Amino acid sequence: MRTLVVDHPLVAHKLTVLRDKNTPSPVFRQLTEELVTLLAYEATREVKTQPVEIETPVTKTVGTAFTKPTPLVVPILRAGLGMLEGMTKLVPTAEVGFLGMARDEETLDIITYAERLPEDLTGRQIFVLDPMLATGGTLREAIKFLFKRGASDVTCICLLAAPEGLSKLEEELSDANVKIVLASIDEKLNEKSYIVPGLGDAGDRLYGVAG
């Protein structure tokens, strides 16, 4: 497993505004989209490509194209949906699947409640979208789910991570072909397993609280 924290002034600026509790949901959504596009630029550096011959208005030349099948983007519901637009703007030809996983706030167990993915993921490059890597439980279970379907190349794009969650992932996935791309590794988890300083509940800040 590899971890990359994207060090860029635009990333730091947008993340600072996201952290601010006074940032309204519409602005939060827009900044999340913009930040994910910046992270995705780094996350896709190793995307699989092949040479392709094209003809410009002047002459024939050899360029670069994605290999087939194209990358598969998998947002983890519901907060991961807020990251999807930023990713597909950069990679519009990617296919999109969905994985519904949630943490029980009392037991901290991970519950899988929905999935829409190909049965066979062999040979697919997969990009998982999940804004907060807190305990690491959700992402760990998502990666295991994808590996069971045949995946062997998974990149996870997150806004923030806690050191505790990263350590747990490293323990269980140290030899796996997994890359974690982040805007920041924060200080710690609090007693409720929230990232500190963090930015609060990403899903609630993206979409509000329904119910």
UniProtKB/Swiss-Prot annotation:
GO molecular function: GTP binding; magnesium ion binding; uracil phosphoribosyltransferase activity
Name of the molecule in the record: Uracil phosphoribosyltransferase
Cofactor note: Binds 1 Mg(2+) ion per subunit. The magnesium is bound as Mg-PRPP.
Function: Catalyzes the conversion of uracil and 5-phospho-alpha-D-ribose 1-diphosphate (PRPP) to UMP and diphosphate.
SUPFAM superfamilies registered for this protein in UniProt: PRTase-like
Family: Belongs to the UPRTase family.
Listed Gene3D superfamilies: 3.40.50.2020
Summary of activators and inhibitors of this protein: Allosterically activated by GTP.
InterPro entries: PRibTrfase_dom, PRTase-like, Upp_B, UPRTase/APRTase, Ura_phspho_trans
Pathway: Pyrimidine metabolism; UMP biosynthesis via salvage pathway; UMP from uracil: step 1/1
Record bears the keyword ATP-binding: no
Keyword set includes Glycosyltransferase: yes
